[in-house]
């Protein structure tokens, strides 16, 4: 008995034996799921079979065939899907929908014990060839996880999906375009000169001032705004709007996100409320007041202003511009900036600390400083670092 170590680091227990004069190999399981003690028990069972004239390899194959007759790829995939208890309901739905749309037609009814690497790869390559590289990459990861689950469940001895490594083109996720900070005065001038729908201009201005995500802004309700406390509370989830996809989305991090409102942001919200306050939604659609503003509205307006939203700047790029400016100023703590960006800290202890502490008072000062910085830049460009020298609210 020995432990076979593959180049990718996976480890398998193997037993060499002779049967009817032929050298054979028996798979005893995957390490560390199968411990040394477990492997020894399986070795001893195999030796007993040999002593009785039974080939343990043949018996195992026959047992596997009987065991896996009713175990299709779809059944095992759904079983694997159900083990991921930490997924949110929304994420779990998206994962299952992706499997249904892209894998189950080709693999769903296939016996999982008979699937080869080429079988698993075929539908994934079809997705890749359609240009959906990121979807293909996720399907490869999930197929590998499903087949690993099958190994761990004793349905198969080896994970053929491991051999798909490198077969699917990697997707280099592109950062959303953002303007160089020195072009902020130009951007502000174009926003001020925008002659389209006023609500669209206010959406752009507010996005720049508080740099929340598109869905966090578009699906917002007036009930989330506390004008007295100057705070916007974005909930983890919202009441879905009938017929509007993803309208239940709140904070992307799925925790309550508090957004302090500068005097400039409050002024914009008060203007919007004056005209559209009778509706539940803050940013209503152009043609239907019961539906939210389109997700393309901000970028469409930026294109009207003359910007290439794929190269120069897009609505999401405002977040990059704000983050760069706040960091460059040297005034604000990393935790305050990260919390305001609603980023999830990788370190779980750090994440818990940041979430609990909130850094709310520092963030109030920070967003007011950012709004004032934008106002100053309407006249001429001044860098965040230089502006921090003349406006440091932490010393006042």
Curated annotation (Swiss-Prot):
Domain of life: Bacteria
Single GO BP term: provirus excision
UniProt family annotation: Belongs to the 'phage' integrase family.
Record domain Tyr recombinase: where: 174-367
Protein name: Putative protein IntB
Active site, per annotation: 213, 252, 316, 319, 343, 353
The organism of origin for this protein: Escherichia coli (strain K12)
Keywords, alphabetical: DNA integration, DNA recombination, DNA-binding, Viral genome integration, Virus entry into host cell
GO molecular function: DNA binding; prophage integrase activity
Domain called Core-binding (CB): residue spans: 71-151
Gene Ontology cellular component list: cytosol
